[in-house]
Curated annotation (Swiss-Prot):
Binding sites annotated in the UniProt record for iminosuccinate: H24, S41, Y112, V113, N114, S129, H197, P198, E199, T214
Subcellular location: Cytoplasm
Enzyme class: transferase
Record-level Gene Ontology MF annotations: 4 iron, 4 sulfur cluster binding; metal ion binding; quinolinate synthetase A activity
Role description: Catalyzes the condensation of iminoaspartate with dihydroxyacetone phosphate to form quinolinate.
Protein's UniProt name: Quinolinate synthase
Annotated Pfam families: NadA
Keyword Metal-binding: yes
Residues holding [4Fe-4S] cluster: C86, C171, C259
Length: 302
């Protein structure tokens, strides 16, 4: 009853504020249910760029809300939990990227969208896990600097003819997924297909039937003719997969693959955000104008 009451108040305030609620696939189930749109980083960036709402309430981690603010400076962007950060995004700063570039002059920088606005501003083009290969292939240079995720960089390197020089960052949640977990699960579910996220270690992706972004996982699960899928990504993804495919069995590779930051946003915080119009996420204009080019170039890659 309490949850229904909060959800009702959120729906009322959303109309009053002319707001849209965007949520990442790793958010709590209650947040996914309250959202107008749930997706992966690429889908959310595209939605933020074209949405006609006056207020964007972004349920994710800070860099995602920042990306919305970069793309839609005329809109109010709210983060219900402003302390929800991203450890991988914090593994490189703008100053560190400038130093990295100075050691490899003239090379283009591909920046995973899981990064700060300052890092995006120092990059030539952004990418997500869904379009990283296409983005890298779109560049004329034979050698590319890739930040901050070394494992996504390794995934791209295997699938392109480019030389990839990666920054040694990683996602702690995906790093907890071990190859032996997949091997053990396959013994119990021999008919299952294995799908994993490209932020996983190479020895994990090597065991997968498909390596997919979370958005691609949604599409794959819907059309796959198998009834059992072993899923290697952050645990929140399982909620959406089960909700949309009740006739299929989804087995997480690891219950330890949890992003605590993604779980910080709750229904009461979402309600408070709409009630108080907090916390507003903004990007300094001198950084935004540099970062928006990298994000928009990514969105133009088909």
């Amino acid at each position: 009853m309490y949850r229904e009451l909060i959800s009702h108040k959120i729906a009322e305030l959303k109309k009053e504020r002319k707001a849209i609620i965007l949520a990442h696939n790793y958010q709590l189930g209650e947040i996914q249910d309250a959202a107008d749109f749930v997706g992966d980083s690429l889908e959310l960036a595209r939605k933020a760029a074209k949405v006609d709402a006056e207020v964007i309430v972004f349920c994710g981690v800070h860099f995602m809300a920042e990306t919305a603010a970069i793309l839609s400076p005329e809109k109010i962007v709210l983060a219900p939990e402003p302390r929800a950060g991203c450890p991988m995004a914090d593994m490189i700063s703008g100053a560190e990227l400038r130093e990295f570039k100075s050691r490899h002059p003239g090379l283009p920088v591909v920046c995973y969208v899981n990064s700060t606005a300052e890092v995006k501003a120092e990059s030539d083009i952004c990418c997500t896990s869904a379009n990283a290969v296409k983005v890298v292939e779109s560049l004329k240079s034979d050698t590319v600097l890739f930040v901050p995720d070394q494992y996504l960089g390794a995934f791209v390197k295997e699938r392109t003819s480019k030389k990839i020089i990666s920054w040694p960052g990683y996602c702690p949640s995906h790093a907890r997924i071990k190859p032996e977990d997949i091997v053990n699960l396959k013994k119990h579910y021999p008919a299952a297909k294995v799908i994993v996220h490209p932020e996983s270690r190479p020895e994990v992706t090597a065991l997968a039937d498909e390596v997919l972004s979370t958005g691609q996982m949604v599409s794959y699960a819907a059309r796959a003719d198998v009834k059992e899928l072993i899923v290697g990504t952050e645990i929140g993804m399982i909620y959406r997969l089960r909700k949309e495919n009740p006739d299929k069995l989804f087995i997480p590779v690891s219950e330890q693959a949890v992003c605590a930051n993604m779980k910080m946003t709750t229904l009461p915080k979402l309600l408070a955000s709409l009630e108080n119009m907090q916390a507003v996420v903004s990007v300094p204009e001198e950084i935004r104008v540099k970062a928006v080019g990298a994000v928009e170039r990514m969105l133009r890659v088909v």
